[in-house]
């Protein structure tokens, strides 16, 4: 029987409460222990302080190394022509014959050749690239067109064909008339750009819901499911991406995800996490927020 992994409602068990408290207790205990040891024995306090500083230094070096390493990987991946690689998957036999002896050192090129070889041998098990669609769902509350517009523009300017992108603007009714007007204006502005531009208004106070982005996108997802059924689109070949209203998608992101989706045999049970860089409006944010944003980008 499948175990329920949801957060329990109501009273927790003693073990559950203990495990909830443990991370915070360890964090606060580590700080309190420094003062306690200093009162008991200054030498022990000094040794403990040195251990804390040394461990922090080691972690800082590790983060710095991984950050530089990750940056290099990102840059290598950005230099790849993902649109061309996706197009290669349409004709795996020809592409494999053309590339198998190529001494290309680009990001995951050898894996690309292996994928072509595998698809050439078992083509029916893989979807054709022209049968793959992206549903891009953007959650909004009360943001204006100056925030939402550039985010939609970034989706429009990706290398993935716009006629295979279904854009969904999921906005909150509690956002008022302003967001409803913004949504309608954006739909008119981007009419004909994507395969379709859907507006989904999330009602207030639905039973069993909490206020937040999750219920908004869940409600929109149900509307998209009905849309896909009405349009007879291949639901097994649809990739769903959720965005905040200020997220700017990288130009090659959709092609990169489509490539991974097509070439993976267990594609229906995959989820994709992009590298999030919190800096598209960093100069408009207060200094403390900038520090937090840069730190979050490191991780």
Residue ranges and their predicted role:
Residues 240:
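Short aromatic/hydrophobic "clamp" motif used to bind/position activated sugar donors
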Residues 129, 151-166, 189, 263-264:
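Short, acidic, metal-binding catalytic loop of nucleotide-sugar glycosyltransferases
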Residues 131, 138-153, 173-174:
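Active-site beta-to-alpha loop of glycosyltransferases that engages the nucleotide-sugar donor
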Residues 117, 190-195, 209-229, 234, ...:
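Long helical/loop segments within the catalytic core of UDP-sugar-dependent glycosyltransferases
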């Amino acid at each position: 029987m499948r175990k329920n992994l949801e957060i329990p409602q109501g009273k927790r068990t003693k073990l559950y409460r203990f495990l909830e408290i443990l991370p915070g207790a360890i964090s606060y205990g580590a700080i309190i222990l420094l003062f306690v040891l200093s009162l008991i024995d200054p030498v022990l306090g000094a040794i403990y302080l040195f251990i804390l500083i040394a461990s922090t230094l080691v972690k800082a070096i590790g983060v710095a190394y991984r950050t530089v390493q990750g940056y290099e990987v990102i840059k290598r991946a950005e230099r790849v022509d993902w649109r061309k690689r996706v197009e290669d998957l349409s004709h795996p036999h020809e592409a494999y014959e053309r590339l198998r002896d190529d001494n290309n050192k680009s990001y995951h090129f050898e894996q690309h050749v292996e994928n072509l070889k595998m698809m050439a041998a078992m083509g029916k098990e893989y979807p054709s690239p022209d049968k793959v669609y992206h549903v891009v769902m953007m959650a909004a509350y009360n943001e204006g067109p100056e925030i939402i517009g550039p985010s939609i523009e970034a989706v429009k300017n990706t290398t993935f064909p716009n006629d295979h992108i279904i854009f969904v603007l999921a906005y909150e009714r509690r956002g008022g008339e302003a967001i409803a007007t913004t949504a309608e204006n954006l739909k008119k502005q981007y009419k004909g750009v994507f395969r379709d531009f859907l507006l989904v208004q999330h009602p207030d106070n639905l039973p069993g819901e909490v206020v937040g982005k999750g219920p908004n996108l869940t409600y929109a997802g149900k509307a998209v499911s009905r849309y896909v059924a009405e349009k007879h689109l291949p639901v097994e070949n649809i990739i769903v991406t959720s965005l905040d209203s200020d997220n700017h998608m990288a130009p090659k992101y959709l092609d990169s995800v489509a490539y991974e989706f097509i070439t993976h045999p267990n594609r229906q049970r995959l989820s994709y996490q992009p590298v999030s860089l919190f800096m598209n409006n960093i100069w408009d944010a207060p200094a403390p927020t900038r520090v937090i944003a840069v730190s979050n980008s490191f991780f």
